[in-house]
Regions:
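Extracytoplasmic gate region of multi-pass secondary transporters
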Residues: 12, 28-79
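Recurrent gating helices in multi-pass secondary carriers
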Residues: 2-10, 38, 42-50, 151, ...
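A late C-terminal transmembrane helix in Major Facilitator Superfamily
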Residues: 167-185
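C-terminal transmembrane helical hairpin of 12-TM major facilitator-type secondary transporters
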Residues: 95-156
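Small/hydrophobic positions within alpha-helical transmembrane segments
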Residues: 4, 40, 73, 77, ...
Length: 185
């Protein structure tokens, strides 16, 4: 590849950026905003992928193989769907796609947030019981909706960066990626 490919001279850096000039980007509120977006979509994606196996085992009594298979099915499509997210962001704009992703995540995560609950209320006529919570199928469907939204959102955040920081795309992408990675762990 190295011998048979060429480089475009316009892609080469013409000025030497200093470390201090790159670190000045940390003072830009937009960079910090993109860090927050990416910590939700990437950090949340990684966090969910790491958490879901144990949750399936402890909450739904799945065996480890079933839970790991669901976690793998959640994690693997993220790359393909990220490419789709790039196309959607190019077509509809990073702003609309990112906010759509955030609203889908908010609604789905709200529904996922309520734990399995068994309530008993003592009444005059005896105890009344209620069970509240999601069974494994709706839980998994909602989790996959969140995963798809987060995969699309990972691309839309970088579309923001390429639109607004074309001359500093490397530094801003590095900062945003660092924050997103830290958020997942």
């Amino acid at each position: 590849f190295w011998f048979f490919s060429y480089h475009d001279k316009s892609h080469l850096v013409v000025n030497n950026a200093t470390l201090s000039s790159q670190l000045q980007l940390l003072k830009d509120p937009n960079v910090l905003r993109y860090c927050q977006y990416y910590s939700v979509v990437f950090g949340g994606y990684v966090g969910l992928a790491l958490w879901m196996t144990k949750y399936y085992v402890t909450t739904y009594d799945f065996d480890l193989k079933q839970a790991a298979l669901l976690a793998a099915c959640f994690s693997l499509p993220g790359g393909v769907l990220r490419a789709l997210g790039g196309w959607i962001s190019d077509k509809y704009g990073a702003y609309h796609v990112t906010w759509g992703v955030m609203w889908v995540c908010l609604g789905s995560l709200f529904l996922l947030s309520y734990p399995q609950t068994h309530m008993v209320i003592e009444t005059v006529n005896g105890p009344m019981t209620w069970d509240i919570g999601l069974s494994p199928i709706p839980f998994t469907v909602l989790l996959f909706i969140v995963g798809i939204a987060m995969a699309v959102g990972k691309a839309s955040v970088f579309k923001f960066i390429s639109d607004e920081y074309s001359s500093n795309i490397g530094a801003v992408s590095g900062i945003v990626g660092l924050v997103g990675g830290l958020a997942g762990f």
